[in-house]
Design a protein with these regions (language model features):
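SH3-family beta-barrel domains
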Residues: 1-16, 26-30, 37-40, 59-67
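SH3/SH3-like beta-barrel fold
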Residues: 31, 44-48
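Conserved tryptophan-centered aromatic signature that marks the ligand-binding surface of SH3
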Residues: 42-44, 54
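A short macromolecule-binding patch
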Residues: 49-60
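Short C-terminal domain-edge/linker segments immediately following a structured domain
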Residues: 36-37, 45
Length: 67
């Protein structure tokens, strides 16, 4: 998958579904590096610290690296 960095000063909520009403799972800190597994309607599916869920793509910046 593509790597992104969480760009949300207050952190980014991971949810069970790609929906703002989806059940809250955990908070991803600002600057966390995530790998996007799937993309759906402005949401990214990712795994972080053993949890797999959805985060808002709006608060993710593409990681710049050696591509």
């Amino acid at each position: 998958g593509t790597e992104y960095i969480v760009c949300a000063q207050k952190g980014l909520r991971m949810r069970k579904k790609p929906d703002i009403r989806g059940e809250y799972m955990q908070m991803l800190p600002d600057g966390a590096v995530i790998t996007v597994l799937e993309e759906q309607a402005g949401w990214f599916k990712t795994t972080y610290k053993g949890y797999t869920g959805w985060v808002s793509a709006e608060y993710c910046c593409k990681a710049t690296g050696n591509d």
